[in-house]
Amino acid sequence: MIPVVALVGRPNVGKSTLFNRLTRSRDALVADFPGLTRDRKYGQAKVGEHDFIVIDTGGIDGSEEGVETKMAEQSLAAIREADVVLFMVDGRAGLTPSDEAIAAHLRKIEKATMLVVNKVDGIDADAASADFWQLGVDEMYQIAAAHGRGVTALIERALDPFFDNLLSTNSEGEIEDLTNMEDEEAEQQEYSEEDAEESLKRLQDQPIKLAIIGRPNVGKSTLTNRILGEERVVVYDMPGTTRDSIYIPMERDGREYVLIDTAGVRRRGKVHETVEKFSVVKTLKAVEDANVVLLVIDARENISDQDLSLLGFALNAGRSIVLAVNKWDGLDNEVKENVKKELDRRLGFVDFARIHFISALHGTGVGHLFESVQEAYRSATTRVGTSVLTRIMKMATEDHQPPMVRGRRVKLKYAHAGGYNPPIVVIHGNQVRELPDSYKRYLMNYFRKSLDIMGTPIRIQFQNSDNPFENRVNKMTLSQERARKRMMSAVKNRKK
């Protein structure tokens, strides 16, 4: 499961700065759900090839009389969702009573906690950090979040227990120069045909993992129980924590599935509960672990920013997507038309996803959901050979030639599969990374249409082909060497 890191500390110690630095390589998901404080942010981040979730637990002021109340509610819940807590303090401001109060509270929680002294750029880091040893910590890490110094070493150390061979040689907490970090993160991962075959084999050996996600009270619980009820599968009533989804194996039409239930543990008698506990972390973990994401939207409410945020997260994760517009029954035709127009207007960026209008309560349209789930999964995992992809690429370039870059025509040579779920097409050629975004979108849409891909995003990766003669030095023949000597001798005689 993807690990979760919580940033804790009093205001203005640099939590948001570190949050933005960690999540900048991918769109940060900012959650503003009912029941959550507005200043708590959840985002997806990456270290090396490993993903993790980071939470900015804003709103903790650490006041001596109010720390128990402040931390006991939303912020404490976020800390409990985390695998690792980064307790941030301000190296320039020094130790404060607020820091001591927060540290005392964190000691009561059995959670891996690391002390992070921020803002140590331009000052004596060791001298600025000395007072913080009073907090009784075993290890202290010094960083400058605004400039990225020490951040990679910190995160590698924090996540080392969750990933093998993560630590670099420079991970002892010292200040390191990361001025080129953005360029390193911008580099694309290179995919080979062997990687694609391995990922496809793993997918073929497993059941389809289907995550049902959505805002609170859109009908996820009702839909889950409707699906399970139709299949006569016992609803598991297992104890779970606030951050763990329930994995329910089921079978439909001879196909094995694992339903990832994010709506929480419920008994059959509680299907119509109006209050639902919502965990952002639980939802993000479910998306990361799923093959197909079923996003439930309430037809009686406008599409919200939270709907778009969840959809964007699933899209960034490369998951297949099916949309279910729930509570469709009872709406008059005029309202239905307005809802459809709103869907077309706001969800154009996922025009590849099937949309179903359903009633989870009465079962209307629920059975057809699995047709789209299977279609999306099939599109995401169907093997496509190099010859087919190369032929499609050549057809695309014949219909619309690549543009000129610095006076030279970009040349696309061949294409092969680089991965599945989502499908990744790797195109090799000259200057291919210089292609404008408009032409990249053209190629992506051309491949999608040609391969009849539906329900899943498709990714195109470009790799510049190596020049086999780049470092080659031609050896002169004997006659060429003699001619060269005669020419050099003539030049010398002319100078005399």
Curated annotation (Swiss-Prot):
InterPro entries: AAA+_ATPase, G_ENGA, GTP-bd, GTPase_Der, KH_dom-like, KH_dom-like_a/b, P-loop_NTPase, Small_GTP-bd
UniProt: GTP 1 binding residues: 9-16, 56-60, 118-121
GO MF annotations in UniProt: ATP hydrolysis activity; GTP binding; ribosome binding
Pfam families per record: KH_dom-like, MMR_HSR1
Domain of life: Bacteria
KH-like domain sequence ranges: 382-466
Cross-referenced NCBIfam families: GTPase_EngA, small_GTP
Protein name, entry field: GTPase Der
Gene name of the encoded protein: der
